[in-house]
């Protein structure tokens, strides 16, 4: 008997079949490179740099750019940015460069060129008869890469913010060592015609390559990263938020995870810490895995580890962090339960409020204060009639342990205490809540309870 078949009856007919499902082409894919090959890209015929510069600059001024031409130019211009590799550079077993070697950004990738010629029109660019300088090339490359960062800014009411960011980036690329090559507000005008360029694989690939190079190599034109820095740890917000969290609470990753009391964390933590990834290696391909196309659906994104993401930002909200209050709640990942756990852990790592004496004239004064606080706690615990049951857990000698926190949650039947709710309401009510944000969630769920 075939162990993969099932038998059942339909209208007096016995049916035997083997259930099969479609293959999941969108399953999580880890970025580890196993074939020993550098990330690769295929582009059209390499252009003459001078011709390409004039054509692209003409397109910038006319707010009409061809993405294939831009990508071909960006790849060709990499040869202009020579730098010295500070250390031996190896990632996933691939030897990228040796310490002291002179390298350019294209050392990171394999570029395949076809015979397809670009549309190097000269309209509007013929007034420039001389060859452009390296500074002019660098300025144009920088402005083009800024289109990536601008296209990553999404959401409601971002027009003014985008305009301000674009203006500031323009100012960078008209100040030494760069030179002014376009008129003011050109970048924002061009962006409106290229608003979705962050979704173009080749453009994203080249932005990630430039960023990976200038993040490692000290260079006169390192400010080119202003437009590409968003490619670092792209689609990796789950892992990034956890890293920031453990640094803030000053615990190791192992010790921090002992506080994650929910069965939904098991699969997410297993997914996030898959062996073989170069999360702790300096300047690996891992940092830019999304841009370089070595991973499909990221296992490190906020949606991939949504319970974990929700918990960390509820703790951040309890601590009053604006970044957490503005973050978007993953609605399908138990936000109510995560807010409860976030309240207890927020109290554990942050205390009851913002105001607490932390600085002293000398060590003796600090010790005297600690002794006084200890005596006050002991006195409160000794008199059961004077301690508010809602506050009693706060005055325990073993507060900072996973066992103690778990016990408090169980004693309160998995519900928040009034002090937790007051804290949540306090930090969220004074914040201008964005749609679907943690601040909005806390306002809606807990404002009436307070």
Swiss-Prot record:
<comment type="similarity">
    <text>Belongs to the lyssavirus nucleocapsid protein family.</text>
</comment>
<comment type="function">
    <text>Encapsidates the genome, protecting it from nucleases. If expressed without protein P it binds non-specifically RNA and therefore can bind it's own mRNA. Interaction with protein P abolishes any non-specific RNA binding, and prevents phosphorylation. The soluble N-P complex encapsidates specifically the genomic RNA, with protein N protecting the genome like a pearl necklace. The encapsidated genomic RNA is termed the nucleocapsid (NC) and serves as template for viral transcription and replication. Protein N binds protein P in the NC through a different interaction, and can be phosphorylated.</text>
</comment>
<keyword id="KW-0597">Phosphoprotein</keyword>
<dbReference type="InterPro" id="IPR000448">
    <property type="entry name" value="Rhabdo_ncapsid"/>
</dbReference>
<dbReference type="GO" id="GO:0003723">
    <property type="term" value="F:RNA binding"/>
</dbReference>
<protein>
    <recommendedName>
        <fullName>Nucleoprotein</fullName>
    </recommendedName>
</protein>
<keyword id="KW-0694">RNA-binding</keyword>
<dbReference type="InterPro" id="IPR035961">
    <property type="entry name" value="Rhabdovirus_nucleoprotein-like"/>
</dbReference>
<dbReference type="GO" id="GO:0019013">
    <property type="term" value="C:viral nucleocapsid"/>
</dbReference>
<dbReference type="GO" id="GO:1990904">
    <property type="term" value="C:ribonucleoprotein complex"/>
</dbReference>
<dbReference type="InterPro" id="IPR023331">
    <property type="entry name" value="Rhabdovirus_ncapsid_C"/>
</dbReference>
<dbReference type="GO" id="GO:0030430">
    <property type="term" value="C:host cell cytoplasm"/>
</dbReference>
<dbReference type="InterPro" id="IPR023330">
    <property type="entry name" value="Rhabdovirus_ncapsid_N"/>
</dbReference>
<keyword id="KW-0543">Viral nucleoprotein</keyword>
<keyword id="KW-1035">Host cytoplasm</keyword>
<keyword id="KW-0167">Capsid protein</keyword>
<dbReference type="Pfam" id="PF00945">
    <property type="entry name" value="Rhabdo_ncap"/>
</dbReference>
<comment type="subunit">
    <text>Homomultimerizes to form the nucleocapsid. Binds to viral genomic RNA.</text>
</comment>
<keyword id="KW-1139">Helical capsid protein</keyword>
<feature type="modified residue" description="Phosphoserine; by host">
    <location>
        <position position="389"/>
    </location>
</feature>
<keyword id="KW-0946">Virion</keyword>
<keyword id="KW-0687">Ribonucleoprotein</keyword>
<dbReference type="GO" id="GO:0019029">
    <property type="term" value="C:helical viral capsid"/>
</dbReference>
């Amino acid at each position: 008997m075939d162990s993969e078949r099932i038998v059942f009856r339909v209208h007096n007919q016995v049916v035997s079949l083997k259930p099969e499902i479609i293959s999941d082409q969108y399953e999580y894919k880890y970025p580890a490179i196993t074939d020993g090959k550098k990330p690769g890209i295929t582009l059209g015929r390499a252009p003459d740099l001078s011709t390409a510069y004039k054509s692209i600059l003409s397109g910038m001024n006319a707010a009409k750019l061809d993405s294939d031409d831009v990508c071909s130019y960006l790849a060709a211009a990499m040869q202009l940015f020579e730098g010295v590799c500070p250390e031996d550079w190896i990632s996933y077993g691939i030897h990228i460069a040796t310490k002291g070697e002179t390298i350019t950004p294209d050392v990171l990738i394999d570029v395949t060129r076809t015979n397809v010629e670009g549309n190097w029109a000269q309209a509007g660019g013929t007034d420039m008869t001389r060859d452009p300088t390296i500074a002019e090339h660098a300025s144009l490359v920088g402005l083009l890469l800024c289109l990536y960062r601008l296209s990553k800014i999404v959401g409601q009411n971002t027009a003014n913010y985008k305009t301000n960011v674009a203006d500031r980036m323009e100012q960078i690329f008209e100040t030494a060592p760069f030179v002014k090559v376009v008129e003011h507000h050109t970048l924002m005008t061009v962006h409106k015609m290229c608003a979705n360029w962050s979704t173009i694989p080749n453009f994203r690939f080249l932005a990630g390559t430039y960023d990976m190079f200038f993040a490692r190599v000290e260079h006169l034109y390192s400010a080119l990263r202003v437009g590409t820095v968003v490619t670092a740890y792209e689609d990796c917000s789950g892992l990034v938020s956890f890293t920031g969290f453990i640094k803030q609470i000053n615990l190791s990753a192992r010790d921090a995870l002992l506080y994650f009391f929910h069965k939904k964390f098991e699969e997410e933590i297993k997914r996030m810490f898959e062996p073989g990834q170069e999360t702790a290696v300096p300047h690996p391909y891992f940092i830019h895995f999304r841009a370089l196309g070595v991973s499909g659906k990221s296992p490190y994104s906020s949606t991939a580890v949504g319970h974990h993401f929700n918990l960390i930002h509820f703790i951040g909200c309890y601590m009053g962090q604006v970044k957490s209050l503005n973050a978007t709640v993953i609605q399908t990942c138990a936000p109510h339960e995560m807010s409860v756990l976030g309240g207890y852990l927020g109290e554990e790592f942050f205390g009851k409020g913002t105001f607490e004496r932390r600085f002293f004239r000398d060590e003796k004064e600090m010790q005297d204060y600690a002794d006084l606080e200890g005596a006050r706690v002991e006195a409160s615990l000794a008199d059961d009639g004077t301690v508010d049951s809602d506050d009693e857990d706060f005055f325990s000698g073993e507060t900072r342990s996973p066992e103690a926190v778990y016990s408090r949650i169980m004693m309160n039947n998995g519900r928040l205490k009034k002090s937790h709710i007051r804290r949540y309401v306090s930090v969220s009510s004074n914040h201008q809540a964005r749609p679907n944000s943690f601040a909005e969630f806390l306002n809606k769920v807990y404002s009436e309870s307070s």
